[in-house]
UniProtKB/Swiss-Prot annotation:
Replication termination factor which is a component of the elongating replisome. Required for ATR pathway signaling upon DNA damage and has a positive activity during DNA replication. Might function to facilitate fork pausing at replication fork barriers like the rDNA. May be globally required to stimulate ATR signaling after the fork stalls or encounters a lesion. Interacts with nascent DNA. It comes from Sus scrofa. Residues 192-306 are annotated as: Disordered. GO terms for cellular component: nucleus; replication fork. One of its GO terms (biological process) is mitotic DNA replication termination. Interacts with DDI2; probably also interacts with DDI1. Residues 241-258 have a biased composition (Low complexity). It is found in: Chromosome. This is Replication termination factor 2. InterPro entries: Rtf2 (IPR006735), Rtf2_RING-finger (IPR027799). Residues 226-240 have a biased composition (Basic and acidic residues).
Length: 306
């Protein structure tokens, strides 16, 4: 029954029960949230950005995540809600003057104070180490403690003076309830942005169609300054001159000689009041008529034979 040496095993040593849930050290969890990038798990270094859920990232890690097209990208669930660089905001952090960094523990003879933070609240002076709630503004990226926003109520930023609304305040590394609330606000914000884009497209199309119609529509005719009698006479002369031209053009296009206008009277140069010198240019003049003796030989071809 016993083992060597006379020992008897007990029940709790032989029967395996349920494993105890391992408790995470709160200090280690806070250090991981406030000092390391959520995506790459590297130490936070400027420029530092935050998403709409209040998580901290290195900006270069976010850019690499967006540029990565491989299948391993699906593993980054912590940044699955980041679709573009516009979904993150670069933070304006205030340095802690008491922060020594790695200089104090280079020899290993000093204690590392995990409660000492790199950044502080510029209004109250609280250290951003996770013991106090901090938030940032989406409009400008300035970071404050929640106590500062509650004690000094204002509608403008305490640092840069930019106006903000309650929807622009996002809690950094909040609780599960805070993350759920920020998730709903993010979805509503993106839905409003999509609806705004859809309403802008038909408005732009309507403006383009109206401009085309205004260009094609004839404008009001403007009368030139002058006497009404002169304008009416000019219009009549233009109409009469355009009529024979159109008739001639129609005849030439059809290939047949255009017929003279029936209304146009025939006139003779002999009956006109022109000078004798002008009339002598034509063959119908008396000086152009010759007798048979003066006429040329029948072989000679001249216009006078006809």
């Amino acid at each position: 029954m016993g083992c060597d040496g006379g020992t008897i095993p007990k029940r709790h040593e032989l029967v395996k029960g349920p494993k105890k849930v391992e408790k995470v050290d709160k200090d280690a969890e806070l250090v991981a949230q406030w000092n390391y990038c959520t995506l790459s798990q590297e130490i936070l270094r400027r420029p530092i950005v935050a998403c709409e859920l209040g998580r901290l990232y290195n900006k270069d890690a976010v850019i690499e995540f967006l540029l990565d097209k491989s299948s391993e990208k699906a593993l980054g669930k912590a940044a699955s809600h980041i679709k573009s660089i516009k979904n993150v905001t670069e933070l304006r952090l205030s340095d802690n003057p008491a922060w020594e960094g790695d200089k104090g523990s280079t020899k290993g003879d000093k204690h590392d104070d995990l409660q000492r933070a790199r950044f502080i609240c510029p209004v109250v002076g609280l250290e951003m180490n996770g013991r106090h709630r901090f938030c940032y503004l989406r409009c400008c990226g300035c970071v404050f403690s929640e106590r500062a926003l509650k004690e000094i109520k204002a509608e403008v930023c305490h640092t840069c003076g930019a106006a903000f609304q309650e929807d622009d305040v996002i809690v950094l590394n909040g609780t599960k309830e805070d993350v759920a609330m920020l998730q709903t606000r993010m979805e509503e914000r993106r839905l409003r942005a999509k609806l705004g884009k859809k309403t802008k497209k038909p408005k732009a199309a309507e403006s383009v169609s109206k401009s085309d119609i205004s260009e094609e529509a004839p404008g009001p005719s403007k009368m030139k300054a002058g006497k009404p009698e002169e304008t009416s006479l000019d219009s009549r002369e233009k109409k009469t001159s355009s009529a024979p031209r159109s008739a001639a053009a129609h005849g030439s296009s059809s290939g047949k000689a255009g017929k003279p206008v029936c209304g146009a009277p025939k006139r003779s140069i002999a009956d006109s009041g022109e000078s004798e010198a002008y009339k002598s240019l034509f063959t119908t003049h008396s000086s152009a008529k010759r007798s048979k003796e003066e006429s040329a030989h029948w072989v000679t071809h001249t216009s006078y034979c006809f």
